[in-house]
Amino acid sequence: MLIQAVGVNLPPSYVCLEGPLGGERPRAQGDEMLMQRLLPAVREALDEAAVKPEEIDLIVGLALSPDHLIENRDIMAPKIGHPLQKVLGANRAHVFDLTDSSLARALYVVDTLASDQGYRNVLVVRGESSQGLEVDSESGFALADGALALLCRPTGKAAFRRGALGGDPAQEWLPLSIPLNTDIRQVGDVKGHLNLPAQPGLPEAVRAGFTRLAGDFPQLNWVREEWFGQGRPDGRCLGPFELASQLRAAQRDRLDELLLISFDPFGMVVEGVTLELAGEAHA
């Protein structure tokens, strides 16, 4: 998979949560809709690559938060691909959404599918608007809100690898769950609850898993998500949106290929995919 261009848009407000899995994360406020973040991020990527919406062959959306995502607060679903297609005007694009998938796994699946279909311009978007979810106050875990857009060109050459978290192999990590509110009576009701138990050493285990997985590709530089503030100089963690600045830095450094590593909090594993990069001159 060739990354042609990157776009990102984050809320200006940050919320800091205490706890072993806490940190300072961008947080959507009030009546903000995810489309307010998605559309600028996508347009940034399209402008950078000089690609028009009608030239997009496939749109793939990834989101975890079951909240009001588009222009209407009554909409509640993690699917973002079709609403984005409509607003963007990408009328000839095929569309599907992936849920409970890491970005690394999604890019690998999309590369395989899209190359088989002969698609040329593929838009992969990752977005969160989680103000309708109760955060885990005990562990301090929350989702980072915002939008990431990757304009890709399938190559059919992506390699994928999954690995365990680092630390004690006998440790059984409890995964993230998002129990939904089954008694929603009005728009402002809580949609669900983020539940990732406070587990000592989890941030270190995730980062150790990243390092170990990267060791399987010693010839490649790697970029990674950052889900936890513990161990960070400023306590700030942008989740998958952390990748935007790293991918741009790799483009500036004229790297031709790298490894992107994601954390899957539902499977409690780390996953990596190899990517090719279009340089700044190409992008």
UniProtKB/Swiss-Prot annotation:
Its main location: cytoplasm. GO terms for molecular function: acyltransferase activity. It comes from the Bacteria. Keywords: Cytoplasm. Required for the biosynthesis of the quorum-sensing signaling molecules 2-heptyl-4(1H)-quinolone (HHQ) and 2-heptyl-3-hydroxy-4(1H)-quinolone (Pseudomonas quinolone signal or PQS), which are important for biofilm formation and virulence. The PqsC/PqsB complex catalyzes the condensation of 2-aminobenzoylacetate (2-ABA) and octanoyl-CoA to form HHQ. PqsB, together with PqsC, catalyzes the coupling of 2-ABA with the octanoate group, leading to decarboxylation and dehydration, and resulting in closure of the quinoline ring. Forms a tight complex with PqsC. This is 2-heptyl-4(1H)-quinolone synthase subunit PqsB.
